[in-house]
């Protein structure tokens, strides 16, 4: 069994064609059997705070768990999963501990910085992902931490995904038009569509489930606010989706049905910890399956 968790970056649910956005920013995923959740709320709107919250049992009533408990990775380890973290973002103090809970940790684009203009794209993770999939372990948990739709948008998609024009030409936001900002952002969404679809292609013949959750949303000019790390409501709405291979679905038809029923349900990111344990069939005193999207 292979459980894949894709940790997204700055992806808004309302900019996905899958969710009814006026632009078809998800031409590839729209052809797949994707369960997309339109109503996920995140407490924190920047990576350093949201990640510890997402990876652990922390919730709004017990936020300290993000710093006093281990993540779901340790529970997968204890159930004989081979666990691997594939990083396309540098580690930060607030979540480095969780990365090192994994059996293996690999970086793509280790020297990249958001201050440069060259390409820093998620397909750099593909060779690492292919290697992890080839591991001899019967049970695998593969975590991919993506750069996704982080600002400077233009460096996070390849030229063939620059479908929406004109795009931003300056890193000084005040000298960009709203149209350019949204076009550049939507091109990152087109690229994320390609990235997730490519992972699905590699998992199609496996007994596998892929869960995607972005760390937070992104402000695109609402109330004059741009990017994230603000309490703007759009930055607290985040994208999430699930894909199951045919053999996984055949083994767990009820998980598929239950997740389908929750597409429009209001949820907090608290669901992730418990849902991943559920997806991997992990029994633990820490699980609360009432929070699982598969129940």
Where are these regions (language model features)?
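Catalytic domains that recognize anionic headgroups
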Residues: 1-295
């Amino acid at each position: 069994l292979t459980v894949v968790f894709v940790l997204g970056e700055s992806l808004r649910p309302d900019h996905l064609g899958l969710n009814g956005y006026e632009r078809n920013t998800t031409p590839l995923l729209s052809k797949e059997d994707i369960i997309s959740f339109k109503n996920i709320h995140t407490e924190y709107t920047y990576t350093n705070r949201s990640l510890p919250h997402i990876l652990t049992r922390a919730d709004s009533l017990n936020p300290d768990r993000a710093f006093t408990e281990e993540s779901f990775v340790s529970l997968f380890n204890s159930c004989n999963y081979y666990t691997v973290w594939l990083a396309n973002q540098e580690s930060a103090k607030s979540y480095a501990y969780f990365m090192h809970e994994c059996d293996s940790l690999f970086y793509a684009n280790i020297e990249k910085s958001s201050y440069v203009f060259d390409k820093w794209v998620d397909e750099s993770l593909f060779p690492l992902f292919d290697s992890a999939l080839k591991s001899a372990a019967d049970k695998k948990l593969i975590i991919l931490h993506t750069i996704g739709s982080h600002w400077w948008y233009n460096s996070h998609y390849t030229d063939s995904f620059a479908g929406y024009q004109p795009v931003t030409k300056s890193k000084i936001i005040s000298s960009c038009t709203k149209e350019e900002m949204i076009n550049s952002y939507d091109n990152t969404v087109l690229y994320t569509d390609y990235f997730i679809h490519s992972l699905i292609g590699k998992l199609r013949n496996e007994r596998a489930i892929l869960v995607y959750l972005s760390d937070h949303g992104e402000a695109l000019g609402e109330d004059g606010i741009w990017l994230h790390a603000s309490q703007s409501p759009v930055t607290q709405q985040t994208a999430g989706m699930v894909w199951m291979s045919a053999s996984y679905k055949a083994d767990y038809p009820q998980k598929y049905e239950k997740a389908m029923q929750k597409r429009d349900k209001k949820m907090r990111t608290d669901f992730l910890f418990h849902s991943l344990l559920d997806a991997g069939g992990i029994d633990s005193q820490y699980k609360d399956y009432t929070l699982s999207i598969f129940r």
